[in-house]
């Protein structure tokens, strides 16, 4: 009697900041930026988030969408083709020059895969893929579309760092929500661009947005004497 | 491995109110702790407010147990790796047996709401070191409501100290009321801060429903560097094949 109902609730679950997927311990460079004085308040934070979204956000969203598309095309496999995933992993590695960022991405990929295995039919391997690769795998397992995976990745690229800024600077959380709402349309745009790219391009030609300042912040953070966030 | 315990803190049920003094979070009647695991290390959480002596207690337990059972420690610092560094420098345990988890300003989140990074850490300890008997998971200093998820640990110890005042047990909360073992630390300071240990013992027992399976121990690590009563309790939690003779 019922027609096809598009999966929406699963997307909300996947993008929920309270999803126990390990993200709460990562600031995405915000802690290092607070320490070096480049984020001191709401305006700085908004600019930081816009820059992050346009670079590493686009990259993550493109790979999440591409992996989701690849898994969906391959059918409801319980074990993903290792060679296909290895290509995506290598491409993300090549786009992530900071070892600290690669480690943070894989740590979050591992924790996301853990919670996803409790929620959906997600295979045991890969155990610790890049976070954006994990998002693509999980989105497909949750019955979501590539554009949903892209949106979740783009959202995560700003939402977690914004929360970290609230904790680190004592910013007004309501005002920070206002900032996130301001850039929500950009999140949608980035997700749409990522989805389109994932449909048209091979893995090696997916967006390679780069933010040298984020790389430097990540590297500096790993050697900081005092550190509250993992990244 | 996620423990998938279906065991609420304090054994389930709604918070109860005590007469007269307003509502308190008391221990409801419930089920005893589940059986100790036999296919991996027993995981024991050590939580409690800032400064109550969690790290010192973990160091004491290492001192007492490291030579007797296969032991690992995971720390959850508020920031950086202060507690892990302290344990390493105290020389009570091989540094390779200590892992630090960073908690993003939210120690309670890492032990209760999002335990994934801690699960990674406890699993990594056993995959790197081989089979262990016991892993102590020390929380970052938080407050009276910060307790462990039973998806992460099998047992939890909540540590308070007399210097916070003898009213602390009366305040209750999930840690005081529902932990498997309540430790009241720094008893040597009681005369200096005017804390009445008998009052603390009475209030703690009341908050914990007077249950024999949920004991309260009083410790002074200054006079007992191996926290022998706590160490004995921990050993008694191990499955019998893992218990040293």
UniProtKB/Swiss-Prot annotation, chain B:
InterPro entries: CobW/HypB/UreG_nucleotide-bd, P-loop_NTPase, UreG. GTP binds at residues 48-55. It comes from the Bacteria. Keywords: Chaperone, Cytoplasm, GTP-binding, Nickel insertion, Nucleotide-binding. Residues 9-22 have a biased composition (Gly residues). GO terms for molecular function: GTP binding; GTPase activity; nickel cation binding. It is found in: Cytoplasm. NCBIfam families: ureG (TIGR00101). Facilitates the functional incorporation of the urease nickel metallocenter. This process requires GTP hydrolysis, probably effectuated by UreG. Homodimer. UreD, UreF and UreG form a complex that acts as a GTP-hydrolysis-dependent molecular chaperone, activating the urease apoprotein by helping to assemble the nickel containing metallocenter of UreC. The UreE protein probably delivers the nickel. This is Urease accessory protein UreG. The gene is ureG.
């Amino acid at each position: 009697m019922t027609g096809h109902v598009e999966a929406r609730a699963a997307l909300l679950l996947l993008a929920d900041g309270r999803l126990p997927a390990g993200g709460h311990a990562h600031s995405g460079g915000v802690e290092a930026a607070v320490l070096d004085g480049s984020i001191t308040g709401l305006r700085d934070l908004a600019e930081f988030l816009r820059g992050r979204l346009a670079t590493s956000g686009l990259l993550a969203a493109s790979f999440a969408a591409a992996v989701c598309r690849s898994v969906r095309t391959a059918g409801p496999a319980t074990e993903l083709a290792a060679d296909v995933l290895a290509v995506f992993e290598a491409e993300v590695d090549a786009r992530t020059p900071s070892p600290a960022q690669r480690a943070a991405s894989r740590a979050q990929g591992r924790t996301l895969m853990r919670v996803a295995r409790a929620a959906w039919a997600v295979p045991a391997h890969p155990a610790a893929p890049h976070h954006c690769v994990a998002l693509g795998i999980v989105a497909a397992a949750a019955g979501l579309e590539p554009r949903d995976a892209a949106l979740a990745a783009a959202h995560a690229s700003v939402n977690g760092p914004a929360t970290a800024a609230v904790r680190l600077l004592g910013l007004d959380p309501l005002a920070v929500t206002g900032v996130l709402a301001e850039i929500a349309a950009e999140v949608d745009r980035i997700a749409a661009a990522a989805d389109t790219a994932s449909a048209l391009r091979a893995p090696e030609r997916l967006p390679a947005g780069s933010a040298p300042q984020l790389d430097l912040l990540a590297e500096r953070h790993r050697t900081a004497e005092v550190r509250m966030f993992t990244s | 491995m996620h423990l998938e315990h279906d065991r609420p803190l304090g054994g389930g049920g709604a918070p109860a109110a005590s007469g007269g003094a307003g509502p308190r979070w008391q221990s409801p009647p419930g089920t005893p702790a589940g059986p100790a695991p036999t296919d991996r290390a027993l995981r024991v959480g050590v939580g409690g407010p800032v400064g109550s002596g969690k790290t010192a207690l973990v160091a004491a337990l290492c001192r007492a147990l490291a030579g007797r059972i296969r032991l690992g420690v995971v720390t959850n610092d508020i920031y950086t790796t202060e507690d892990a560094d302290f344990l390493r420098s105290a020389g009570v345990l091989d540094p390779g047996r200590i892992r630090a988890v960073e908690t993003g300003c939210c120690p309670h989140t890492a032990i209760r709401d999002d335990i994934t990074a801690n699960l990674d850490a406890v699993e990594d300890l056993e995959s790197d070191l081989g089979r262990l008997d016991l892993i102590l998971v020390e929380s970052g200093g938080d407050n009276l409501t910060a307790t462990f998820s039973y998806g992460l640990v099998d047992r939890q110890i909540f540590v308070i100290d007399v210097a916070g005042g003898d009213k602390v047990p009366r305040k209750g909360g999930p840690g005081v009321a529902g932990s498997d073992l309540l430790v009241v630390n720094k008893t040597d300071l009681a005369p200096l801060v005017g804390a009445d240990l008998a009052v603390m013992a009475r209030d703690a027992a009341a908050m914990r429903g007077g249950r024999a399976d949920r004991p309260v121990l009083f410790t002074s690590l200054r006079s007992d560097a191996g926290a022998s009563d706590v160490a004995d309790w921990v050993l008694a939690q191990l499955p019998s094949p893992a218990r040293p003779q």
